[in-house]
A protein has these predicted regions:
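Conserved, non-catalytic sequence blocks in retroelement Pol enzymes and Pol-derived host proteins
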Residues: 31, 50, 66-68, 105-107, ...
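Basic, flexible linker segments flanking DNA-binding modules
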Residues: 13-112, 262-273
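Short alpha-helical "recognition helix" segments of helix-turn-helix
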Residues: 2-7, 56
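RNase H-like polynucleotidyl transferase catalytic core
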Residues: 4, 93-95, 146, 174-181, ...
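C-terminal domain-tail junction helix/linker
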Residues: 173, 195-197, 221-277
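Generic alpha-helical secondary structure signal
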Residues: 10-14, 36, 156, 189, ...
């Protein structure tokens, strides 16, 4: 290179830059069988538009295993999704609120259940209110109740408690039940009913939604992955879909806290009978 630069009376750095520009740039890496994965990934992304590449990886691998094909790692799925413009926008929100360093998650199923309520707004102004009970280990929705244009009553919560106990236990013996301080949970009748079922009622501190973080996280997931991507013209339409949403969450939703397994898969792995659909 020095001899050429001296003969042409130019700087070596200039020649290096010329050579670098003439060199063919390396294209994006592709494996020969990426084309076999692309239709599967595209279908899953179309079906689950709110899922990122890790959850898409979990769903894709379930289907690959069923058909006897080797699984794909998340880096490969990420690369294929990036090359085809299927990645979600990066989350830029900042978490606000006080630090919560308590521990809500437990080491096995049926040690603690969490419960909360939320509402869904329909396009015509109807409101659908829901309450649910979720296991703090396997994240399965054990019982739920929904009502249109009315509030969740104490009797509905008590029915939900009984359904949860009957679903998980042959005998009446149940775990801690962690809720917020809503009146339907703190009512004397509800607390007495919980005690009769051998539930141990626990309530979060005032102004500390993080203490019921499993329930809060589920509400966020449910609204993002189901409510906001489906048509909700009125309460009747919403009520018709809710049962299917809960069933799909229990059977299919990959959860990062369960090593990307669904709640149903986690129950089966732990030799625990899941709630029937």
């Amino acid at each position: 290179m020095k001899a050429v630069a001296d003969a042409l009376e130019v700087a070596r750095s200039h020649l290096h830059e010329k050579v670098r520009r003439l060199a063919k740039p390396r294209g994006s890496y592709r494996k020969p069988d990426d084309g076999d994965l692309l239709p599967l990934i595209r279908r899953l992304v179309d079906e689950r538009p709110t899922y990122g590449y890790r959850r898409i990886t979990a769903l894709a691998n379930r289907e690959l295993v069923k058909t006897g094909k080797p699984m794909a790692n998340h880096k490969r799925i990420f690369r294929i999704m990036r090359q085809n413009g299927m990645l979600l926008a990066r989350h830029t929100g900042r978490r606000k609120g006080r630090l919560h360093d308590g521990k809500v998650v437990v080491m096995r199923s049926n040690l603690r259940w969490c419960s909360d309520g939320f509402e869904i707004s329909c396009w015509n102004g109807d409101l659908v209110r829901l309450a649910f009970i979720i296991d703090a280990h396997d994240r399965e929705i054990i019982a739920w109740h929904a009502v249109a244009n009315a509030g969740i009553s104490g009797s509905m919560v008590r029915d939900m408690m009984l359904e949860a106990v009957e679903s998980r236990f042959a005998a009446i013996q149940a775990p801690h039940a962690l809720t917020d301080n809503g009146s339907v949970y703190t009512a004397h009748e509800t607390r007495a009913f919980a005690t009769a079922l051998n539930l141990v009622p626990c309530f979060t501190p005032i102004q500390s939604p993080e203490s019921n973080g499993i329930s809060e996280s589920f509400v966020k997931t449910f609204k993002r992955d189901y409510v906001r991507v489906n048509p909700l013209p009125d309460a009747i339409t919403a009520l018709r879909q809710i049962a299917g949403w809960f069933l799909d969450y229990n059977e299919n939703h990959p959860h990062s806290g369960l090593k990307m397994r669904s709640p149903r898969e986690s129950c089966e792995l732990n030799h625990h009978s899941p709630v029937s659909g």
